[in-house]
């Protein structure tokens, strides 16, 4: 559905309406630039992109530890994005522009800097995939300051929807906690239920995102991510897809200078 976002978002902007657009903002950097151009003409930020992980409590705690600075700078971030399965319509490109795009935006937000280069590594493929699909893949990214990020995208793992993240600092490592609220310990062992979908895992984040946007609109204010964030994520996606199609070659992320409007 990403291909239909740009025309509708631009119509909302032209009507002077706030809009919460599901990711991606658009499927091409050119369409993102068109959106930003239309928005800047209004002189007002109107577009929020639906990157809901910015509203997840655990990710926010992780960011607070980093921003506090007690444990030094970020050095590495390890991510795992695992799905139990995907439909046959899911493509290898979607592993990047529909799945990894969540980590792409979250890493930009968490670290407070842009991703400047990316490559795609291809491990041994799972036998659980459809024949047309490359799965799993590992998206390897580097930020402007040199933080190295890896993201395992593994969408046919069968057992659960599992989102994992570990932030490695100079004197500490910060990891997202377990997905469920309780563990059961009995004669059969120590266990907890596993999420089976993104709604299971991020229901509270979705609700927080929507309520934050509704409240902001009521105050005639912008909240959350901007069109620039949508554009930046799409630029990283474009470079990653280039790498996927070029045997994993390292690709530079090409972006315009950030307009003062989005500073």
Pin down the residues of each PLM region:
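C-terminal helix-rich "cap/oligomerization" subdomain common to oxidoreductases
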Residues: 33, 215-263
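Rossmann-like NAD(P)H-binding beta-loop-alpha module
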Residues: 57-79
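Rossmann-like dinucleotide-binding domain that binds NAD(P)(H)
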Residues: 86-160, 228
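Beta-loop-alpha module in the N-terminal Rossmann-like domain of NAD(P)-dependent dehydrogenases
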Residues: 1-38
């Amino acid at each position: 559905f990403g291909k239909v976002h740009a025309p509708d978002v631009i119509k909302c902007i032209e009507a002077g309406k706030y809009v919460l657009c599901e990711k991606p903002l658009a499927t091409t950097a050119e369409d993102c630039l068109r959106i930003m151009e239309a928005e800047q003409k209004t002189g007002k930020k109107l577009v929020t992109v639906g990157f809901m992980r910015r509203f997840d409590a655990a990710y926010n705690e992780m960011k607070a530890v980093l921003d506090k600075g007690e444990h030094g700078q970020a050095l590495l971030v390890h991510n795992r994005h695992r799905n139990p399965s995907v439909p046959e319509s899911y493509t290898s490109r979607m592993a990047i522009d529909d799945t990894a795009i969540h980590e792409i935006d979250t890493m930009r937000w968490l670290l407070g800097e842009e991703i400047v280069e990316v490559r795609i590594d291809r491990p041994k493929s799972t036998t659980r995939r459809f024949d047309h699909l490359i799965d799993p893949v590992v998206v390897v990214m580097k930020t402007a300051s040199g933080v190295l990020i890896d993201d395992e995208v593994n969408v046919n793992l069968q057992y659960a929807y599992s989102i994992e993240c570990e932030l490695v600092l100079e004197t500490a490592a910060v990891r997202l906690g377990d997905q469920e609220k309780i563990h059961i310990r009995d004669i059969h062992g120590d266990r907890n239920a596993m999420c089976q979908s993104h709604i299971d895992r991020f229901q509270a984040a979705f609700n927080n995102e929507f309520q934050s946007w509704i409240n902001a609109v009521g105050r005639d204010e912008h909240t959350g991510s901007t069109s620039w964030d949508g554009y930046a994520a799409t630029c990283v996606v474009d470079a990653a897809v280039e790498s996927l199609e070029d045997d994993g070659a390292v690709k530079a992320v090409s972006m315009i200078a950030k307009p003062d409007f989005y500073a």
